[in-house]
């Protein structure tokens, strides 16, 4: 076993993720594929988890996911929607009712930072639904060390390629759904750069590709692909919509209607169904 570990360690020097160097003469992989390296950030589709923090593995009630943030990262999730609150003076992740589950924001961001340090060929995105001050978000990003990996994009400019982001080691996109602050150029206002589908669907028949928030001319497109019950997340609802052909057909329909690649494909219970097959299909056209 020792020899195998040594072999893996030897590849780290290439600056790619695990397995870099396998292709004809040592090309670096970007988010798992050499094919993505020269695509701009907005030319790739990323598997995303809705309410990523709310998960059964960590004991949350009414969770949106089965597994926690570290497990999600290891499975290949490359975007997370995270809700931030001030709970009695502590900055935490929770979903509406912090009594159902909460966690210090800095702890979760530190886990993300550690994973990205260990996987230098990976680009990752966060979309904050923030109910805290921008300065409080910034403090947690700084304390976790994630600040060193952030990228600040200028609206209207072309997005860099994954290779450029990886070589500069600015591999973390931090977006939020409310305006940012000139003091924190890396804390990007999502709706300056992106648009989305609606997200309040009770049944599969309700699904729509209509523009909701954001400008459909914006370069990034968020596909909300989850059903909501009055109580929140439901693995039974995920079972209904997370499988192909329904899932891929909706993604392709929205790509066609919106004339835009779904960049962030957001689901509940990512481990149920075909999320990774869908993003792979979108990325292989």
Labelled PLM ranges:
Residues 27-285:
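Catalytic cores of phosphodiester-bond hydrolases, prominently lipid phosphodiesterases
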Residues 1-27:
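Ser/Thr-rich, Pro/Gly/Ala-heavy low-complexity intrinsically disordered linkers and tails
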């Amino acid at each position: 076993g020792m020899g195998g570990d040594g072999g893996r360690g030897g590849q780290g020097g290439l600056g790619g993720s695990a397995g870099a160097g396998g292709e004809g003469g040592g090309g670096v992989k970007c988010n798992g594929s050499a094919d993505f390296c020269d695509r701009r950030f907005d030319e790739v589709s990323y598997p995303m988890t809705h309410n990523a923090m709310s998960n059964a593995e960590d004991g949350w009630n009414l969770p949106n996911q089965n597994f926690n943030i570290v497990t999600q990262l290891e499975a290949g999730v490359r975007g997370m929607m995270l809700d931030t609150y001030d709970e009695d003076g502590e900055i935490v992740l929770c979903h509406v009712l912090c009594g159902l589950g909460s966690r210090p924001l800095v702890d979760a961001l530190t886990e993300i930072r550690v994973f990205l340090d260990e996987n230098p060929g990976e680009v990752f995105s966060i979309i904050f639904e923030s109910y805290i001050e921008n300065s409080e978000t910034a403090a947690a990003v700084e304390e976790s060390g994630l600040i060193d990996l952030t990228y600040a994009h200028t609206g209207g400019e072309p997005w860099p390629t994954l290779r450029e982001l990886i070589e500069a080691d600015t591999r973390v996109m931090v977006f939020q759904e409310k305006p940012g602050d000139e003091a924190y150029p890396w804390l990007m206002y999502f709706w300056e750069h992106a648009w989305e589908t609606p997200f309040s669907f009770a049944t599969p028949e309700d699904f729509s590709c209509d523009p909701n928030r954001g400008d459909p001319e914006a370069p990034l497109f968020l596909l909300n692909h989850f059903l909501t019950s009055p109580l929140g997340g439901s693995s039974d609802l995920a079972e209904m919509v997370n499988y192909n052909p329904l899932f891929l057909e909706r993604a392709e329909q929205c790509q066609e209607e919106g004339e835009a690649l779904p960049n962030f494909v957001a689901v509940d219970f990512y481990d149920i169904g075909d999320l990774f097959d869908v993003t792979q299909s979108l990325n292989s056209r």
